[in-house]
C-alpha cells in the first residue's frame, strides 16, 4: 500500500474566466470545487498512473466536509482525524487568455494536541501496513510539527520506505529523522536551512551532507531551471524540458508521483528521473493539477537530459540471451 500523509489539506474553489479585468467586476466564471493539498495532488497523479494510494489527513468543519466529498467524487481513498478548526480553503482564479493563475488562501487551522496525539496513534498502525509512506505538504501549526519526524522514525523502525516533501520550521527535524528520500524545491531548502547555496559545488556539498545522514535519494528541483539529484553518493544534473508554462501548481507533487511510480516498478534511477521530470513539465503546461496521462509522459520522457556529476554508475545488462 502507498500511504500519503497530508497535514494541511486545502479546499479550493476554482473560478475560470476567459479573461480577467483587474479592478472590475468579473462575471460568468466556470466554477469548480476541488480537493487540494500536496499529498492529495500526489494521490491524484498516482491514480493516473494506475497506482492506488491511501490518504491520511486532518479534516474539520464545513470546509472539511466539502473537501471529503470532493475526494469521494474523485474516488481517492482516505481516512481522517477530525479537527475543531476548519480545513483551510482558497479561491483560485484563472485567466485563460492571460495564462495567469492567482490564489488567495485562508489562514492555516490550529490543530489541538489531542488531535495530534490521535493522529500519531493511528499513524503507527497505518505505517506498519504500508509499503511506502509519503509525507507531503506543510505543517499547519506548531502542534503538528512533530508528526512528520515521528512518522519517519516509525517508517525506519518498521523498515518501510519514506519520502519527505515538506518545508518550514520543522524541515530540519524531518531531515534529522532520516527519511529514505527527500524532495524539495531549492528555494525551500535555502529558506528552511538558511544555507547559502549559490553554485554547483555548494549544491553537491549539501547533497553529500544529506547522504551522510543516511538519506538515500535526494531531489532538489528548481522550477524550470536545471536541478540536481542524488542516488546514494552518485549525483546527477537534470535539464528539464522547455515548455510553455500555464500553471506550475502541483508540478512538484506530480514529480513525486513520478518518483514513486519508478520505485514501485523498480525502474533504474536515471529512468525514474526522466519520467518524473517529464510528468512535472506536462503538469505545468496545463491549468489542471496533477492530472497528467501516463501515455503523454512516455512520449517525451527520453527528451529529458540526465547527466552524471563526478563518478559514474555502471549499468549491467542482465536480460536473458540465447546461447
Task: For each feature predicted by the language model, list its residue ranges.
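Positively charged, low-complexity intrinsically disordered leader regions
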Residues: 1-21
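Substrate-binding N-lobe of the ribokinase-like
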Residues: 27-87, 300-303
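Conserved phosphate-binding/catalytic loop of the ribokinase/pfkB sugar-kinase fold
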Residues: 93-129
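Short, small-residue-enriched loops and turns at beta-alpha junctions
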Residues: 110-112, 139-143, 170-172, 245-246
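Short acidic, glycine-rich surface-loop motifs adjacent to enzyme active sites
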Residues: 130-140
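Conserved phosphate/ATP/ADP-binding segment of small-molecule kinases
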Residues: 146-233
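Conserved phosphate-binding/catalytic region of the ribokinase-like
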Residues: 172, 200-323
Amino acid at each position: 500500500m502507498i500511504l500519503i500523509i497530508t497535514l494541511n489539506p486545502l479546499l479550493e474553489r476554482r473560478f475560470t474566466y476567459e479573461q480577467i479585468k483587474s479592478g472590475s467586476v468579473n462575471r460568468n466564471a466556470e466554477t469548480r470545487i476541488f480537493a487540494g493539498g500536496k499529498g492529495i495532488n500526489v494521490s491524484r497523479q498516482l491514480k493516473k498512473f494506475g497506482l492506488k494510494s491511501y490518504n491520511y489527513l486532518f479534516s474539520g468543519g464545513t470546509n472539511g466536509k466539502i473537501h471529503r466529498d470532493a475526494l469521494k467524487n474523485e474516488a481517492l481513498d482516505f481516512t481522517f482525524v477530525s479537527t475543531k478548526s476548519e480545513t483551510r480553503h482558497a479561491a483560485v482564479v484563472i485567466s485563460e487568455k492571460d495564462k495567469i493563475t492567482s490564489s488567495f488562501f485562508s489562514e492555516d487551522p490550529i490543530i489541538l494536541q489531542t488531535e495530534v496525539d490521535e493522529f500519531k496513534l493511528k499513524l503507527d498502525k497505518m505505517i506498519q501496513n504500508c509499503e511506502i509512506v509519503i509525507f507531503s505538504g506543510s505543517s499547519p501549526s506548531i502542534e503538528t510539527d512533530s508528526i512528520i519526524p515521528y512518522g519517519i522514525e516509525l517508517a525506519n523502525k518498521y523498515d518501510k520506505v519514506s519520502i519527505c516533501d515538506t518545508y518550514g520550521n520543522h524541515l530540519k527535524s524531518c531531515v534529522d529523522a532520516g527519511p529514505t528520500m527527500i524532495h524539495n524545491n531549492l528555494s525551500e531548502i535555502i529558506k528552511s536551512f538558511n544555507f547559502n547555496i549559490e553554485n554547483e559545488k555548494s549544491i553537491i556539498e549539501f547533497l553529500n551532507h544529506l547522504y551522510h545522514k543516511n538519506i538515500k535519494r535526494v531531489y532538489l528541483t528548481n522550477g524550470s531551471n536545471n536541478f540536481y539529484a542524488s542516488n546514494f553518493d552518485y549525483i546527477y544534473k537534470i535539464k528539464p524540458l522547455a515548455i510553455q508554462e500555464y500553471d506550475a501548481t502541483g508540478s512538484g507533487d506530480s514529480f513525486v508521483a513520478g518518483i514513486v511510480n519508478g520505485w514501485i516498478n523498480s525502474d533504474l534511477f536515471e529512468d525514474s528521473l526522466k519520467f518524473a521530470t517529464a510528468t512535472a513539465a506536462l503538469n505545468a503546461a496545463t491549468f489542471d493539477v496533477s492530472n497528467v496521462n501516463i501515455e503523454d509522459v512516455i512520449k517525451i520522457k527520453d527528451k529529458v537530459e540526465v547527466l552524471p556529476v563526478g563518478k559514474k554508475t555502471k549499468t549491467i545488462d542482465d536480460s536473458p540471451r540465447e546461447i
